[in-house]
Amino acid sequence: LPAYICKSVVDCFQEQYEICFYQLNQSLGIEKESIEKQIDESVSAVYIMHYFGKMQDANILEYIQEKQKVYQFKIIEDTTHSILTKKATIGDYQICSLRKWFAIPDGGVLYSVETLEADKIVEQKESVAQILEAMLLKYMFLHCGTECNEMYRKIFVEQELALDEQQKIYKISDISEFLLKCEDILDIKERRKENWNYIMKSLDNKKVIPLYNEKSEDFIPFSFPVLVDERDRFRKYLMEHKIYCAVHWPMETKEQCEIKTNMELTKHMLSLPLDQRYDLEHMKYMVEIVNEFK
């Protein structure tokens, strides 16, 4: 597994596999020297991820693929951050959490170069209903002035914990499937790219450093990751101005915590939102607030 990865992925594999971590650089690219040391005949699967919409270096992917021919391991490709940039590269299997991209209460996708067979699965209706309730409460808090912040956050936390412990596979809900069919993917791509370009052009604060400046034509950003020395103070400052940002990820295992790059990212990285809900006026407001941070 990549050393910089969320706890839910580690937990998923830890139950049945011995995990070895390979290192990433500060721009979240795979360190070739590190993965070279890890891949041998004992490896049954290699998990790769493309972070924040930026694809891993093609030469590294080619190297992993060449090693696969020698050692016959499977490649699992996490496209949760990159599915709109590119659906697949070298993976035998791809996985993506669609609810990270779209305003839906549930839904993910598993796809493969191989034919997949699955048992008949049903919806998890109770959980979906609670998440829909939380989404509505969040909207009322953000846009209607309703004092329900603690209420919606409590539901989200409870449902995320339940999802982490879930063993059974459920079908995507009918409401999420319907909402996905209503999405204009081309418009979403254009909006995200436009917002990324505006932030990159207008950000002017030496305390807030973009993780990278990606300019490739096919790149569709997941969010706008930045590094800030006083990340927690910066996040609180943004919240005071109604800008809510995600942080990634607390490191859980001893091996992960011993890697310097991991801890620097965990302590200092934050994602500025730029998804399709927001237009250039929103970006202008956010960048003005960010630039005023002292």
Named regions from a protein language model:
Residues 1-72, 76, 82:
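PLP-dependent aminotransferase-like
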Residues 4, 23-28, 81, 98-102, ...:
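Short, acidic/turn-prone active-site loops that include or flank metal/cofactor-
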Residues 5, 47, 118-294:
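PLP-dependent aminotransferase class I/II
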Residues 9-11, 31, 57-58, 85-87, ...:
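Short glycine-/acidic-enriched loop or helix-start segments at secondary-structure transitions
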Residues 74-111:
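Conserved active-site segment immediately N-terminal to the catalytic lysine
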Residues 108, 115-118:
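A charged, well-structured terminal subsegment
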